[in-house]
């Protein structure tokens, strides 16, 4: 689940 958060964070970045 942490990977998902990191992935979304990268997209928003």
Curated annotation (Swiss-Prot):
The answer on whether this UniProt entry bears the keyword Oxidoreductase reads: no
Coiled coil stretches, renumbered: none
Where's it found, cell-wise? Answer: Secreted
- In terms of one coarse class, where is the protein primarily found? secreted
State the signal peptide span: none
Q: Which GO terms describe its cellular component?
A: extracellular region
Tissue expression remark: Expressed by the venom gland.
Q: Name one GO biological process term.
A: chemotaxis
**Residues bearing PTM Serine amide:** 13
Q: Keyword Secreted on this protein?
A: yes
Q: Mind telling me what this protein is named?
A: Chemotactic peptide
């Amino acid at each position: 689940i942490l990977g998902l958060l990191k992935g979304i964070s990268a997209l928003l970045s």
